[in-house]
Amino acid sequence: MSDNSKTRVVVGMSGGVDSSVTALLLKEQGYDVIGIFMKNWDDTDENGVCTATEDYKDVVAVADQIGIPYYSVNFEKEYWDRVFEYFLAEYRAGRTPNPDVMCNKEIKFKAFLDYAMTLGADYVATGHYARVVRDEDGTVHMLRGVDNGKDQTYFLSQLSQEQLQKTMFPLGHLEKPEVRKLAEEAGLSTAKKKDSTGICFIGEKNFKNFLSNYLPAQPGRMMTVDGRDMGEHAGLMYYTIGQRGGLGIGGQHGGDNAPWFVVGKDLSKNILYVGQGFYHDSLMSTSLEASQVHFTREMPEEFTLECTAKFRYRQPDSKVTVHVKGDKAEVIFTEPQRAITPGQAVVFYDGEECLGGGLIDNAYRDGQVCQYI
């Protein structure tokens, strides 16, 4: 058996059950483990309680229980500069960003990884549901987590080969109930703590209220694609393509009682377009353009790839053909896709392996750009 005691692994600990069990498993496997709590956002919850303080208390309790040293590190400036400013800029541009993808790329596997190296880390580890496997030549492949409902490779798709070389995902081969069971058997104080939801820096707060603190809302007209006035929208940034709720129009416009959906945005005229029916023509597209395209291992500068893709988290894979040129790609769908949303990630898979991905710029329907923004 190999001696892991000479291998230092720095674990990103959030105060949740997943990262607690990550640290526990590595400690049990004999690694030299250090726990790090990242404070990325200065926050209080609806009751005025600082959530970071409460989470750090949980980290301290777990670290003491399993017998590992722990530190807290403040990445608020890095988070604001590299993630939150991007998040706001995307909303200003009428897009719907995915801050979790950027947070992993810029904070958890850049700022945190760099900090861990100053502590003499050989690897960093997180509680993500993903797997890494190493070829004989040392190349690392990132595979989906075994728990299909929890697989987080979608959010890790912008990681580089260099980052993956230094990363361990101890939970990748486990299902979520097994993780809870391990925490309970070890008597960890976080065993029954509920999973966090929502964007990391917003937590459980009302999204609309949160966003309005940073971006002034500009109400405008809500219209059908054929020009019927449907009332007023609260501000384009509050709506995403394919959204059903929150339109306030129900079936009051006579005739068809089919539900209404957001089908497009015109940023220059501040118009929100709506249409009836889940598969409204305006929601369907046949291809997309992506930028910031990146692969988890070395690929040619220009190539074509037949693979599957996800256009949002927890969506089933769809067959696609990808034409890559530098950091841009055209992605052609085998079957038309619904509600392709600029700003979201498109992520490519070859079977179990996550190959990488990019950010969606435009969706196309038979060669014509969809009026999404």
UniProtKB/Swiss-Prot annotation:
Binding positions for ATP per the UniProt entry: 12-19, 38, 127
Enzyme Commission number(s): 2.8.1.13
Location in the cell: Cytoplasm
Keyword RNA-binding among UniProt keywords: yes
Signal sequence range: none
Ranges for region Interaction with tRNA: 150-152, 312-313
Interaction with target base in tRNA: annotated segments: 98-100
Domain of life: Bacteria
Primary location group: cytoplasm
One of the GO BP terms on file: tRNA wobble position uridine thiolation
Any single Pfam family the record assigns to this protein: tRNA_Me_trans_M
Cystine connections: 103-200
Function per UniProt: Catalyzes the 2-thiolation of uridine at the wobble position (U34) of tRNA, leading to the formation of s(2)U34.
Family the UniProt entry places it in: Belongs to the MnmA/TRMU family.
Record protein name field: tRNA-specific 2-thiouridylase MnmA
Source species: Streptococcus pneumoniae (strain CGSP14)
